Amino acid sequence: MKAADVRALSADQLKEELAKLKKEQFNLRFQKATGQLEKSSRIDEVRKDIARIKTIARQKAAEAKA
């Protein structure tokens, strides 16, 4: 997910997307532990998407306060 796409989302949409990604991250970790994971690079992609969403959500919150 690109940063521009994330910036276009509302606060509620950001929370929903974050919850979805965290669930996916959990499932990927579980698949890795059981040896069923096919694309190990997806773990890094999801981790970076989560960080991107958290960063932009924090920036939006700071802008709203200022």
Swiss-Prot record:
Ribonucleoprotein among keywords: yes
InterPro entries: Ribosomal_protein_uL29 (IPR050063), Ribosomal_uL29 (IPR001854), Ribosomal_uL29_CS (IPR018254), Ribosomal_uL29_sf (IPR036049)
UniProt-listed GO biological process terms: translation
UniProt xrefs under Gene3D superfamilies: 1.10.287.310
Keywords: Ribonucleoprotein, Ribosomal protein
A GO-annotated cellular component: cytosolic large ribosomal subunit
SUPFAM superfamilies in the cross-refs: Ribosomal protein L29 (L29p) (SSF46561)
GO molecular function, one term: structural constituent of ribosome
Recorded superkingdom: Bacteria
HAMAP family (alphabetical): Ribosomal_uL29
Similarity comment: Belongs to the universal ribosomal protein uL29 family.
Name of the protein described by the UniProt record: Large ribosomal subunit protein uL29
